[in-house]
């Protein structure tokens, strides 16, 4: 998910998405430990998306807005 797409979501949607991604990350790590993970790059993608969501939530909390045209 791109940062631009994330910024279009409301805070409630972001919190729900964050919860879903954390659950997915847990499942991916479990699959990795048991040797059943097909795509290990998915872990990286999920972690980065979680970081993007947390960053955008924090920006909104602080009132920071980044306009890039």
Curated annotation (Swiss-Prot):
Gene3D superfamilies: 1.10.287.310. The keyword Ribonucleoprotein applies. It comes from the Bacteria. GO terms for biological process: translation. GO terms for cellular component: cytosolic large ribosomal subunit. PROSITE patterns: RIBOSOMAL_L29. One of its GO terms (molecular function) is structural constituent of ribosome. CDD domains: Ribosomal_L29_HIP. Keywords: Ribonucleoprotein, Ribosomal protein. Belongs to the universal ribosomal protein uL29 family. NCBIfam families: L29 (TIGR00012). This is Large ribosomal subunit protein uL29. It comes from Thermoanaerobacter pseudethanolicus (strain ATCC 33223 / 39E). The gene is rpmC.
């Amino acid at each position: 998910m791109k940062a631009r797409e994330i910024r279009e979501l409301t805070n409630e949607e972001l919190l729900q998405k964050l919860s879903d991604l954390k659950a997915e990350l847990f499942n991916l790590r479990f699959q990795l430990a048991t040797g059943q993970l097909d795509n290990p790059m998915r872990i990286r993608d999920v972690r980065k998306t979680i970081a993007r969501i947390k960053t955008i939530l924090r920006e909104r909390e602080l009132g920071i807005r980044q306009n890039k045209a």
